């Protein structure tokens, strides 16, 4: 691959939607295929980066946790400097990085990534939040490059109708893609990887 800036994939979504589980699965699936690293955002701790390290997502020096303080959406949108600095450090440390995953801190449906921080945005919501989540809209649901409706296994327990969520997601997103997933069983993971590779021009 010719030298170029790494593809930066932002993963956003509310607390508990499955962002870190998705990040872990992506790391395990792609770490031997691409020169990659991860930046995680937490408000006052580095819990997500520690989780990825404990679960051996990849070499610990390729996982950077930043503490955003205050509102986590500020660090991915209004003032992305702390994340941009972490990315610069990783690019200096690892020559020829091809892929950097930026996991946001848990936030509301209005949070979006700054275009200067993320080339591709994945937004994760979960079925446990209720079948009304897609129709509530917000930039994450309507404008993300890929909407991921996670934890499909919980639908019977919370009384969520996946058909309704499917119809609402289509209505809210128009032609933009979305998919259902279960990161516990890696259901949907291959489709997410294919999307990243296709959009990131890793594959023809």
Curated annotation (Swiss-Prot):
GO terms for biological process: urea catabolic process. GO terms for molecular function: GTP binding; GTPase activity; nickel cation binding. The keyword Hydrolase does not apply. It comes from the Bacteria. One of its GO terms (cellular component) is cytoplasm. Keywords: Chaperone, Cytoplasm, GTP-binding, Nickel insertion, Nucleotide-binding. Belongs to the SIMIBI class G3E GTPase family. UreG subfamily. Facilitates the functional incorporation of the urease nickel metallocenter. This process requires GTP hydrolysis, probably effectuated by UreG. Homodimer. UreD, UreF and UreG form a complex that acts as a GTP-hydrolysis-dependent molecular chaperone, activating the urease apoprotein by helping to assemble the nickel containing metallocenter of UreC. The UreE protein probably delivers the nickel. This is Urease accessory protein UreG. The gene is ureG.
């Amino acid at each position: 691959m010719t030298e170029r800036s790494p593809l930066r994939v932002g993963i956003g979504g509310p607390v508990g939607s499955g962002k870190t589980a998705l990040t872990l699965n992506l790391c395990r699936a792609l770490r031997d295929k691409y020169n990659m690293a991860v930046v995680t955002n937490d408000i006052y701790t580095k819990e997500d980066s520690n989780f990825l390290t404990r679960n051996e997502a990849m070499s610990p020096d390729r996982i950077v946790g930043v503490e955003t303080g205050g509102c986590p959406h500020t660090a991915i949108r209004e003032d992305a400097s702390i994340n941009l600095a972490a990315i610069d450090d990783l690019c200096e440390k690892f020559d020829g990085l091809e892929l950097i995953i930026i996991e946001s801190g848990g936030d509301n449906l209005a949070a979006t990534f700054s275009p200067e921080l993320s080339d591709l945005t994945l937004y994760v919501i979960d079925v446990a939040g209720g079948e009304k989540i897609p129709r509530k809209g917000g930039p994450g649901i309507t404008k993300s490059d890929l909407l991921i409706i996670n934890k499909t296994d919980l639908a019977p327990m919370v009384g969520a109708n996946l058909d309704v969520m499917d119809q609402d997601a289509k209505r809210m997103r128009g032609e933009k893609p979305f998919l259902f997933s279960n990161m516990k069983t890696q259901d949907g993971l291959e489709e997410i990887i294919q999307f990243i590779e296709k959009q990131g021009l890793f594959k023809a």
